[in-house]
Amino acid sequence: MKKENSETKEKKKHKFLKRLLWIGLPILVLIALIVPTNKYIEVPGTTEPVNQMITVDGKKDTGKGNFYLTTVQIAQANLAMIIYSHFNSFSTIYSAEDLMGSMDSAQYDLVNQFYMQTAQNTAVYQAFKQAKMPYELKYDGVYVLDIAKNSTFKNKLQIADTVTEVNGKTFKSSAEMMKYIQSQKVGGDVNIKVTRIDGKDYSFDGKFVKISTGKTGIGISLVDHTEVVSTPKVKIDAGSIGGPSAGMMFTLEIYNQITGKDLRNGREIAGTGTIETDGTIGQIGGVDKKIATASKEGAEIFLVPDSGSKKADDNNYLAAKEAAKKLKTSMKIIPVKTLDDAITYLETGKVND
């Protein structure tokens, strides 16, 4: 009798645990799917035709072939996404600090829009300069992107402020401004004037500090605030896409339109890379994901920055080749260091040394 009672209790216990498992498992799955973590996941984004974003003198490019910019998608990760990333070589997990530094998500998005605006202005400038056509580049100061902990302007400046003067001096470029600042002594007095997003002007006093490079600074991360006036007029509308990495592709599309040249020759050409005021093509993040999305969309050629470094972590070209090998794609990976390199390849098929 005792044995039967014991067996009955075991059966009831087994049934209870089974029910608990069936109830608990969906709850755990739901938690994994909807509860966010403090991590972010980066995965392949989209491949967007640039000719749909740019008008020159009110007209779009209707020629054969396309230039494409490429994006990554970043989202706050849940547990399921983190697990997924361990089995997908084209996804990366970042902490909030690694991704955004001291910024919140709203500030991060705003900064990326400033990067995009600068990329567009520099693209117009470089395309018209390359084509030897009339343009005017206006330097309005520098956008404040981040403020260092040791900056004496930490609780005075705001992200998105435009610094217009330092100690009563105005400048023609951020490089000129930084040269002046670096010539000053750490601990010396400094006054800066800024313009806020609302258009109001402010003046703040502080001290020069030693920054992470060991040089004198005021403790801010910055990007040029510029405007470009060109003839004919160029308009770029990239929607909600942010960041600087479409600079090269914008430049090629604008150059293609204003010169009447056919750089594409009917080809589907994707790429990534910043465009700098001296014509160099700068490194970007997430190049492996951009190779993945471009390959998926059928691009024939991918133009990618080549820093010259022998390490893939420091050279987009090497990282892109590794990604292409994993994907077994037939898409050609073409290294470029300057805008001239990109144009030369598209016109002749030759890669500059």
What are these regions (language model features)?
Residues 196-253, 352-353:
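C-terminal, low-ordered peptide segments at domain boundaries
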Residues 278-310:
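Glycine- and Gly-Pro-enriched alpha-helical subdomains that act as flexible
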Residues 131, 178-222, 323-341, 345-348:
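PDZ-domain C-terminal substructure recognizer with occasional recognition of PDZ-binding tails
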Residues 98, 105-118, 147-150, 164-167, ...:
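Second-shell loop/turn segments in exported
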Residues 129-159:
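PDZ/PDZ-like groove recognition
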Residues 1-16:
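N-terminal Lys/Arg-rich, disordered targeting/topogenic segments
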Residues 153-177, 294-307:
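Conserved PDZ fold ligand-binding element
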Residues 18-36:
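Hydrophobic membrane-insertion alpha-helices, especially the h-region
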